[in-house]
């Protein structure tokens, strides 16, 4: 039996998938079912609004929207849904994604979009996990274990560096 998707991962173009797949991978690490769609704010606005308005009916709880250039997709989706929307600025050849970042982060009052770094789809996926984990104790426990593993990795790298440094200066 297929589980209902909990997170929608959408992008303005299929070329954005090279960035947005990092969100999908992060969500898969926590076994969160997703749906993935290409929904363009400029080329298919009716479908975009339909997607946003009906996401709740499909049991979607969070939408991650990636877009480059003018990057209107996250904000327009946020205007049409009560769900949290996480915007991912997708870097393009021109301006390295700065235009996308500014477009997504500068939302008017009343239409919030949580925005991650340029190309930060993995963090968008992890933020979606945290949002879901705020009301799911089992998922929250998985997040705590994930954070513990991150901390252990940093401690191990520090220990390696201290050993290496000691060899260099004769400690």
UniProtKB/Swiss-Prot annotation:
Keyword Glycosyltransferase (UniProt): no
Entry keywords, A to Z: Isomerase, Purine biosynthesis
Region forming the signal peptide: none
Pathway: Purine metabolism; IMP biosynthesis via de novo pathway; 5-amino-1-(5-phospho-D-ribosyl)imidazole-4-carboxylate from 5-amino-1-(5-phospho-D-ribosyl)imidazole (N5-CAIR route): step 2/2
GO terms for MF: 5-(carboxyamino)imidazole ribonucleotide mutase activity
GO annotation terms (biological process): 'de novo' IMP biosynthetic process
UniProt xrefs under SUPFAM superfamilies: N5-CAIR mutase (phosphoribosylaminoimidazole carboxylase, PurE)
Enzyme class: isomerase
NCBIfam families xref list: purE (TIGR01162)
Family the UniProt entry places it in: Belongs to the AIR carboxylase family. Class I subfamily.
Protein's recorded name: N5-carboxyaminoimidazole ribonucleotide mutase
Lineage per the UniProt record: Bacteria, Bacillati, Actinomycetota, Actinomycetes, Mycobacteriales
Gene (name only): purE
